[in-house]
Amino acid sequence: MASPSCASTLPWTAAAFSYPRRLQTRRAPSLVIVAQGRVKKYRQVILKDDIDEISGKKGDTMKVRAGFYRNFLLPKGKATLLTPDVLKEMQLEQERIEAEKKRVKEEAQQLARVFETIGAFKVPRKGGKGKQIFGSVTAQDLVDIIKSQLNRDVDKRLVEVPEIREVGEYVAEIKLHPDVTAKVRLTVYTK
């Protein structure tokens, strides 16, 4: 057996562990994980641009995969998520656009009534023998007459004039709106 003096020098002897020590352990802070349930695979989005990949046009609401939205549409700024606030804003914008379209159509109808109540625009031309005139009456001629008599600007591309090469009465059409076409009477005479 070992001598008592020896026992005090060896750390592994029973003398070194005569009283039980409490082991100190440090605990890491606990991380609480809460399950979110199933992740939505699709997202409702409003397109800001025309997108060929999904055959969508600006302003359309579409259902797209979450990854496509997160990785392609969102970084490029081509779509926003459809939320109740965005939906309400979109409806207000749609109502404003519809009111503007209605106002433009009413103005076009009013202008068409003005053109039809005027009677006939008189177009002077230099004439030849009989009913023949020199040159022809073009859309630009009609636009100039309307501007001088009514102080209204009309785009000549919207005016459809039949081929006029003789003195007489003619009817021209002015497309003021996709739904409104005004018929204008022309009286061509020689000077």
From Swiss-Prot:
UniProt main location, coarse: plastid
Stretches of the chain forming a coiled coil according to its record: none
Record keywords, A-Z: Chloroplast, Plastid, Ribonucleoprotein, Ribosomal protein, RNA-binding, rRNA-binding, Transit peptide
Cellular localization per UniProt: Plastid, Chloroplast
GO BP term, example: translation
InterPro entries listed in its UniProt record: Ribosomal_bL9 (IPR000244), Ribosomal_bL9/RNase_H1_N (IPR009027), Ribosomal_bL9_bac/chp (IPR020594), Ribosomal_bL9_C (IPR020069), Ribosomal_bL9_C_sf (IPR036791), Ribosomal_bL9_N (IPR020070), Ribosomal_bL9_N_sf (IPR036935)
GO cellular component, one term: mitochondrion
Functional note: Binds to the 23S rRNA.
Cross-referenced HAMAP family: Ribosomal_bL9
Annotated protein name in UniProt: Large ribosomal subunit protein bL9c
Organism: Triticum aestivum
